[in-house]
Each structure stands twice: as C-alpha cells, then as structure tokens.
C-alpha cells in the first residue's frame, strides 16, 4: 500500500462500554478537533482494567487499516493521578493470521515502515504491539497543545487518549506531544509464553475464550508449530490442565471437524493454536477457562 487514506482515521478501543455516553463524548471531541476524521470503533466491551485483554484486541490492527491511522487505545485505572499516556510510532507492521500474510484481496496490502501511531496509557497496554511491530520513537503525552491543562480527573481515557489522538490525526507532530521516552520507561507486562521441547512437544496456556463462540485460544503460535514440525494434517494429542484430552489432526477450519458439535484443533485468525467444536461451544459446557495449561504432543 503506497498511499495513506485520503481522510484521517482514528481506530478507537476502550473499556468504556456502550451503555452510556462516554464513548460518544470521546468521539465528539475527536470530530471537533479533527473535523474530517473517520472514527472506527474497534471494541468498547473489553473487561474493565484488563490490560492483557486490551492488548490482544489492538496488536493485529495495522494490517487491516490504511497507512496513517492513529490507534487510540485505552483502559485507564490510573485516571486522576500523575500518570500520562504514551504515543509511539511503530516500526514495521507485522504480517499475521493463520498463514502469516498481509490482509486484503489477492496477496493483500503490504504496509510501509513508520506508517502508524498508537496512543495509550503507559500501563502495559502496548506490550504486544511493541513486541510484534517494534517502534521507532515514543513520547510521553503531556503538552497542553494536545491535552487539557486541567484534565478531568475521573476520565483520563477521554482527556489523555481521545483528545490527543485527534490532534495527532489532524497532523500535530508526534515529536511535540511531550518528552521522548527511553525504552525502559515504557511499561510492559510479560505475555503468556509457549515452549517447544527438543522432542517437538509444545506447552503453553489458554489465553482467551473466544466469546461468544466458546472457542479456546492458546499461547502456542504458528511459529512454535512450525518449529515442532507440526502442519495441517498432523495428528496431535492436546491436554488441558492434565484433565481434558483431545486427539485430533490439525485442521484449517471448523467444518473439517465433521458433524455439528465435533471437536476441531486449528490455527485461529490471529495465528495461535486453538480448540473448538463445529458450530458449538467448547468452553462453556466444560467450564474451560483462561490460564489452564496446554500440552501438545504428536499422537
């Protein structure tokens, strides 16, 4: 993709919900500051204050959005404190999905280096973004050109993320939003890991339940599968928490399971090993949850 979209875009992700006017206030200010902006709602129903969940929803976005998009992403438990947001320009958008490719028709739309900005609380929300895409520059968001001189203390998602994101979308220089941050100043959490043994056995954890479908997502990435010599058609034994065993071939999609309700193991659209039932929930009937251990061997 060689050109930015002709209008500014803000992709907005928050934990604000949609049962009141909070999101509308943020979007109204975005459109007041950058009057020709297109605001895309990514998600506003994540679990409040769950930084790791929020990180999962924002890491894949660059390969779906036009170059020049500003990603305004927020869950702000430190609202009202001296905490400030961080704005980063990512280095090079990573390919993704089950097949490690660009999104779009044909071969998809390749992205350019340095073509996206994220703004978020400096609380770890950008951990996986920085891990997957890298970054070229990062700044504390503190200039009163882009944030209120006296921010509303109970609504930093609006004051410290939504408002400055609109200024950035309108062309305000990233390097002027505040002081440049050292890498050590950017807060990160430790993402769930996966390991591959010399024998090709894999281990990880359940990272998410894919609501509302009840599919099980794990921390085992397609790269881990390739390292273990696992591909589509490989017969696998998968054990969750040493209790729930499954013996299935790795399949490209749900319909390969056969009948409705039959189990299937696949690589999800984010590139991670997952378990499901064809057109039925796996997690809810069996009370499967995030954090359960996952062990994978060839059967």
UniProtKB/Swiss-Prot annotation:
Activity is not severely affected by most metal ions (Mg(2+), Mn(2+), Co(2+) and Fe(2+)), but both Cu(2+) and Zn(2+) are strong inhibitors. Its EC number is 2.5.1.63. Optimum pH is 7.2. InterPro entries: Fluorinase (IPR030978), SAM_HAT_C (IPR046470), SAM_HAT_N (IPR046469), SAM_OH_AdoTrfase (IPR002747), SAM_OH_AdoTrfase_C_sf (IPR023227), SAM_OH_AdoTrfase_N_sf (IPR023228). The keyword Transferase applies. Optimum temperature is 65 degrees Celsius. Exhibits excellent thermostability, suggesting that this enzyme is a promising candidate for biocatalytic applications. It holds the Pfam family SAM_HAT_C. Keywords: S-adenosyl-L-methionine, Transferase. GO terms for molecular function: adenosyl-fluoride synthase activity. S-adenosyl-L-methionine binds at residues 15, 20-22, 76, 157, 210, 215, 269-270, 277-279. It catalyses: fluoride + S-adenosyl-L-methionine = 5'-deoxy-5'-fluoroadenosine + L-methionine. It is an enzyme of class 2 (transferase). Belongs to the SAM hydrolase / SAM-dependent halogenase family. Catalyzes the formation of a C-F bond by combining S-adenosyl-L-methionine (SAM) and fluoride to generate 5'-fluoro-5'-deoxyadenosine (5'-FDA) and L-methionine. This is Fluorinase. It comes from Actinopolyspora mzabensis.
């Amino acid at each position: 993709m060689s050109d930015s979209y002709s209008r500014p875009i803000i992709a907005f992700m928050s934990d604000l919900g949609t049962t009141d006017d909070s999101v509308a206030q943020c979007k109204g200010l975005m459109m007041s500051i950058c009057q020709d902006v297109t605001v895309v709602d990514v998600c506003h129903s994540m679990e409040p204050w769950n930084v790791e969940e929020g990180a999962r929803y924002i890491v894949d976005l660059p390969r779906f959005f036009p170059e020049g998009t500003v990603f305004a992403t927020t869950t702000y438990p430190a609202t009202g404190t001296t905490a400030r947001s961080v704005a980063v320009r990512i280095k090079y958008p990573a390919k993704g999905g089950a097949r490690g490719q660009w999104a779009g028709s044909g071969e998809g739309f390749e992205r350019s280096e340095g073509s996206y900005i994220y703004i978020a609380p400096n609380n770890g929300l950008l951990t996986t973004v920085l891990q997957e895409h890298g970054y070229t520059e990062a700044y504390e968001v503190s200039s009163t050109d882009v944030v209120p001189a006296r921010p509303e203390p109970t609504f930093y998602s609006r004051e410290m993320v939504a408002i400055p994101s609109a200024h950035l979308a309108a062309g305000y220089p990233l390097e002027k939003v505040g002081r440049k941050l050292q890498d050590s100043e950017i807060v990160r959490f430790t993402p769930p890991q996966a390991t591959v043994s010399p024998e090709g056995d894999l281990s990880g954890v359940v990272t998410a339940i894919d609501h509302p479908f009840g599919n099980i997502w794990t921390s085992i990435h397609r790269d881990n599968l390739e390292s273990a010599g696992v591909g589509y058609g490989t017969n696998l034994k998968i054990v969750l928490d040493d209790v729930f065993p499954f013996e299935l071939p790795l399949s490209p999609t749900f319909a390969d399971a056969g009948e409705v309700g039959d189990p299937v193991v696949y690589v999800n659209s984010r590139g991670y090993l997952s378990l499901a039932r064809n057109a039925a929930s796996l997690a809810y009937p069996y009370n499967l949850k995030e954090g359960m251990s996952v062990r994978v061997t060839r059967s």
